[in-house]
Every structure is written in structure tokens, then in C-alpha cells.
């Protein structure tokens, strides 16, 4: 499994953000995956990146318990985090984020959860807008398996998280040692197809399968 996780981080860094020598890397990952820090550090060093800055995120149940209706503290925390990220926009930094696919929370705390999400939305928009102003900022967002997500998808499995990771590694190609090369070939093929379509200057395209019809 450790080898596959190394392959996965390799894909994230070399394909997702395509980190270059002497670049800063800002990584946002769930707190339950803090163990990936060692792999990020190792891979970044191999790719001659400058430094890795980490932000570990709690799930919503943890946040609701931690802040308990005192959401101004959470607001202040995200304000500080966002200010740090904004300062990195001018420092040749690339940004990688792995989010929880589905995040568990108590249904009875739905209103409190919405308050947390509104605070997050405010600072996410602030960072995104500033990133657009600066331009040419490389960032990559993805999802990462979690226990609750696995239980939702594989309710009959005895070890649903293991099953989800098995599928996830197949989809990301991290179960191949040459995953980066495979991804790059796929990207090149897509770019060649786009180039071909541009050259043909089609006025419209029609795509049809047994279940789908698409007209562009």
C-alpha cells in the first residue's frame, strides 16, 4: 500500500501541479492523512521543490465540536490561513488540495453546519478571486477516500474503506509504477484530439450512444 501511496503523490505532484525546481508547494489534506506528509516531503525533495507548507483540515463533526457556536474563532482561523495563502501567490507557489469525498456530520446540527460552510465559502472565494487577479497560478484539487464516503458507497462490505481505496487507486492509476507516464500519454492524446478539432473548424458535433445524445 505504501508503494501505491508514493505513486499517488507522484501523480499529484508531477501531473496535478507539475511542481518545478525551487517552487513552493502548499498542501491541504484531511487531518486523518497526516501520515502522507512524509511522502510529500520525500517526493518534493526528489523533484527539487523548495518547501512544503501544510494545512490539515478537520471533518465537519470535529469542527462543530471544536467551535460550538463560537464560529467567529473559526472565521479568524480561516482569515489567518487565507492571508498566508495570499502572501504565497507572489512567491511562485503551487497549491494542491485533497478534500474528503463525503464528509459526515450530525443531521441535527444542519444549521450550525451551514454557518461553518458560509465562512469557508467566503474565504474560498476571496482566495480564488485573488488567484485570478495574479494569474498563472497552478493549483490542483482532488478528493481522497474517507470512512464515511466508503460506507455510503459500499454498505455491504466488511472493510469498505479498503474497497474504496482499491477502486481509487485503479482510477488514479496509482497501482501502476509508471502512472505518471500513463497520465502524460493520456493528456497528450487529448491535446492532439483538441488540436485536430480546432484544425477541422467543425461548425457542430454530434455524439450518440445507447444512453446519451449530445449536440454541440
Which residues make up each language-model segment?
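Active-site bordering "gate/hinge" segments
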Residues: 1-216
Amino acid at each position: 500500500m505504501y508503494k501505491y501511496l508514493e505513486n499517488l503523490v507522484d501523480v499529484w505532484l508531477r501531473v496535478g501541479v507539475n511542481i518545478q525546481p525551487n517552487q513552493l508547494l502548499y498542501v491541504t489534506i484531511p487531518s486523518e492523512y497526516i501520515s502522507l506528509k512524509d511522502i510529500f516531503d520525500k517526493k518534493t525533495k526528489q523533484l527539487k521543490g523548495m518547501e512544503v507548507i501544510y494545512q490539515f483540515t478537520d471533518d465537519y463533526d470535529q469542527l462543530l465540536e471544536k467551535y460550538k457556536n463560537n464560529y467567529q474563532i473559526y472565521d479568524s482561523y480561516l482569515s489567518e490561513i487565507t492571508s498566508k495563502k495570499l502572501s504565497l501567490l507572489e512567491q511562485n507557489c503551487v497549491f494542491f488540495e485533497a478534500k474528503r469525498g463525503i464528509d459526515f456530520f450530525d443531521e441535527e446540527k444542519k444549521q450550525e453546519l451551514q454557518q461553518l460552510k458560509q465562512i469557508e465559502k467566503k474565504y474560498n472565494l476571496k482566495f480564488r478571486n485573488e488567484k485570478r487577479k495574479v494569474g498563472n497560478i497552478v493549483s490542483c484539487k482532488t478528493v481522497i477516500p474517507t470512512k464515511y464516503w466508503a460506507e455510503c458507497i459500499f454498505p455491504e462490505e466488511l472493510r469498505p474503506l479498503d474497497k474504496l481505496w482499491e477502486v481509487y487507486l485503479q482510477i488514479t492509476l496509482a497501482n501502476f509504477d509508471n502512472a505518471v507516464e500513463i497520465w502524460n500519454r493520456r493528456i497528450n492524446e487529448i491535446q492532439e484530439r483538441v488540436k485536430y478539432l480546432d484544425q477541422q473548424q467543425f461548425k457542430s458535433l454530434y455524439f450518440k450512444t445507447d444512453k446519451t445524445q449530445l449536440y454541440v
